[in-house]
Amino acid sequence: MPIASHIPLPPDDGHDARPNEFDSVAAGASPAAGSVVERLDSASSVVDGVVAGFLFLFVFGSGLIHIESFPPLWFDEGWTVCVARTWVELGHYGCLLRGEPAPPSLAAHFPVVASVAASFTLFGVGVWQTRLVGLLYTLGAFLLLYALARRLYGRSIAIAALALLLLVPLKWSIHPLCVGRQVLGEMPLLCFLLAGYVCFLRSTHRPLWQAATIGCWALAWMTKAQVAPFLVASIAGTMVVMSLRGDWSVVGRLAVAMIGSWGGCRLLLYAKDWLLAGHIMPHPPVDGMTEAIALVFVPSIRLETIRYLFVSWPEYPLGLAYAAWRVGGTSGSVAKVSVEQTVQTMLLLLAGSWLAWFAFLSAGEPRYALPGLFLAA
């Protein structure tokens, strides 16, 4: 969510939220547009209910059409569905090989498999029951994105972020509504990540919300280990910024969140192993995944990913660059920053590091860019 609203935010937990000079200039430059934005941002909470209803209709209205056949169930989904079905029907967490129990192999991580298994338990085994899980996580991710953007930038910017994701064309195979129809890790990951940031906004002097933040990020870490370097960059980078400004209370909270998220993920993994003891076979190691997916230096792939990001999707890097300029422009204005400004910095670093990795190091699969694009909206 890189574009900041010119509407000053209410102070949070004793921090002073102040508009800056750029906001005043923007407001004076376009009074007609400003009045529309002001009316929207000051509207009653009924507008939020309308947005939530629209998202529900948009996600499920489009998602339930040909849910079993479009797109066809494919390799990545098949592993997860196989493990969830075998777990529900036979009690074995894995697949079958020639009728004998086998490891889960390339299935999605436990939170995704467990969600699909819960759907199978409630509604029976089938393709629509599988993909219903993806739709629920997709709706959750959109609602949390709206809630987060509304708190950080105002209602008008939150609605604009949703419009960008839903209406501005990406490659169709990675459109959130298309990915959300499938049993993949991206939408659950985004749901848990965004829930963590929403909880962090409420965590100042509130230990329960701090614990909720840690729990959400631990689930995100467990859902897709790919997020680890970017989440660490988001938190650690913000700690550096806050330490340079001498805001040590924020540095301490971020340190607790980062260490707690890692520890929480380890605890969840131990809990999973305890739960599945006697129902799972050892997972064979998969060598070479880092070189195949995460660190690729083939020139043709690098040119393709750079073209994707800066030619096909230029609004996202441009928006992040503008957000970085705004953050830099206000860095020395006050001794302490509000919790909103802290989260803005964290999201900027998270989305920026993710998209930089996609452009300059990834294997080039467009789906790898989706979390970064979603967060950059």
Predicted regions and their residues:
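Membrane-interface transmembrane helices that cradle and orient dolichyl/undecaprenyl
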Residues: R18-N20, S156, L193-A211, A220, ...
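Transmembrane-helix signature of polytopic, membrane-embedded enzymes
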Residues: A52-L55, L145-W172, L190-C191, T204-A212
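Transmembrane-helix motifs of polytopic, lipid-linked glycan transferases
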Residues: G53, L57-F60, L132-Y153, A195
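Extracytosolic helix-loop segments that constitute the early lumenal/periplasmic catalytic or substrate-binding loops
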Residues: G61-H66, G78-A114, A118
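Aromatic- and kink-enriched transmembrane "portal" helix at the membrane-lumen/periplasm boundary
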Residues: I67, V127, R131, A141, ...
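Transmembrane-lumen/periplasm boundary regions of multi-pass, lipid-linked membrane glycan transferases
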Residues: T86, V232, T238-V339
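Hydrophobic/aromatic-rich transmembrane helices and adjacent perimembrane loops
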Residues: L135, E186, P229, T345, ...
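Membrane-interface alpha helices of multi-pass inner-membrane proteins
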Residues: C199, W209-A225, A236, W354-L355, ...
